[in-house]
C-alpha cells in the first residue's frame, strides 16, 4: 500500500501543477434568463482540496442553465482559511453577488469552514439556502496528512491543510437560511491508502447530528469526495431540489449499507 501511496502522491503533485497553471474563476450566466440581476438567482459553489485534482466539468454540466447563474470561485488560499475568506469576499464583490434576488450555496469541506467564517464577517441578506457536503470519512484526512505527511501536505496546499486540521468546525447560526447536509458514504482512494491509520481512529458515525450544524434536511449518497467532483450529476437533482424547496425530495434518508471501502478491497 505504501507503493500505491507514493504513486498517488506523484499524481496529485502533477494535478497541482496543472491546477496552478489553469485554475480560474468560473462565471456562467443562465442563457435562458434575461431578467436583471435583482430578479435572478445564483448558485455559489465553494469547492475544497479536491478541486486541485478535479476539473469543474461535471459541476458545470450539472448546474448550468437550471434557472440559476453559476459561480465557482478559485478561492483556495495556501496560507489559511482566513485567506480563503478574503478571496471569497473579493469574488463576491467583483461579481455583485449581493445584488441577486437569492444566492444558494454548495459547500465542500474546506468550503464549509470558509463559508461559515465568511458569512459571519460579511453577511449577505440574500443567501437563501446552503447545502453542506460533509464526509465522516474524508474529514479524517487533514489531521492524518498533518501528522503523517507534513511535507507532502505543505507542497500540495501550503499551510491550508494544517489550518483545517487544527480548526474545530464552527457552525453557522443563521435562522433565516435553509440548511441541508449531504453526507458522503464512500471513501476516497487516498483514504484507502491511509486505511491502517484510519482504523486506529475513533469510530465514525454517519448521524447528521455529529456535524454540529443546524439542518432542515439531510440525505445520503454512496459517493466519495472525489465523486462529488466527477459524478456530482448523481446528487445534483437532490441539491437543486433543496435550493428550490428546502428539502432533498426523494433522496435517501437512511445511512448507506455498503462498505465504504468496498471499491478498493476488490483490487487489493
Regions found by a protein language model. Give the residues of each.
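Bacterial N-terminal signal peptides that target proteins for export
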Residues: 1-9
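Bacterial N-terminal signal peptides
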Residues: 9-17
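Short aromatic-enriched loop/helix-cap "lid" or pocket-rim segments at secondary-structure transitions
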Residues: 57, 141-146, 190-195
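Serine-dependent carboxylesterase/thioesterase catalytic core
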Residues: 44-45, 70, 82-176
Amino acid at each position: 500500500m505504501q507503493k500505491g501511496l507514493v504513486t498517488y502522491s506523484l499524481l496529485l503533485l502533477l494535478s497541482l501543477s496543472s491546477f496552478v497553471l489553469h485554475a480560474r474563476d468560473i462565471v456562467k450566466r443562465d442563457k435562458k434568463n434575461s431578467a436583471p440581476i435583482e430578479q435572478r438567482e445564483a448558485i455559489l459553489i465553494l469547492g475544497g482540496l479536491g478541486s486541485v485534482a478535479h476539473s469543474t466539468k461535471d459541476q458545470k454540466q450539472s448546474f448550468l442553465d437550471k434557472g440559476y447563474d453559476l459561480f465557482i470561485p478559485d478561492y483556495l488560499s495556501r496560507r489559511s482559511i482566513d485567506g480563503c475568506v478574503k478571496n471569497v469576499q473579493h469574488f463576491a464583490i467583483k461579481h455583485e453577488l449581493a445584488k441577486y434576488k437569492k444566492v444558494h450555496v454548495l459547500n465542500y469541506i474546506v468550503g464549509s469552514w470558509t463559508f461559515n467564517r465568511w458569512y459571519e464577517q460579511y453577511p449577505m441578506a440574500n443567501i437563501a439556502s446552503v447545502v453542506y457536503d460533509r464526509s465522516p470519512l474524508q474529514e479524517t484526512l487533514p489531521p492524518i496528512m498533518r501528522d503523517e505527511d507534513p511535507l507532502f501536505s505543505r507542497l500540495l496546499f501550503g499551510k491550508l491543510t494544517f489550518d483545517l486540521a487544527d480548526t474545530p468546525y464552527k457552525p453557522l447560526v443563521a435562522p433565516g437560511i435553509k440548511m441541508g447536509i449531504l453526507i458522503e458514504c464512500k471513501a476516497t482512494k487516498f483514504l484507502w491508502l491511509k486505511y491502517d491509520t484510519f482504523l486506529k481512529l475513533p469510530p465514525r458515525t454517519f448521524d447528521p447530528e455529529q456535524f454540529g450544524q443546524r439542518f432542515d434536511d439531510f440525505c445520503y449518497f454512496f459517493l466519495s469526495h472525489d465523486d462529488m467532483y466527477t459524478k456530482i450529476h448523481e446528487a445534483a437533482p437532490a441539491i437543486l431540489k433543496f435550493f428550490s424547496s428546502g428539502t432533498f425530495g426523494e433522496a435517501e434518508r437512511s445511512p448507506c449499507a455498503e462498505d465504504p471501502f468496498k471499491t478498493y478491497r476488490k483490487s487489493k
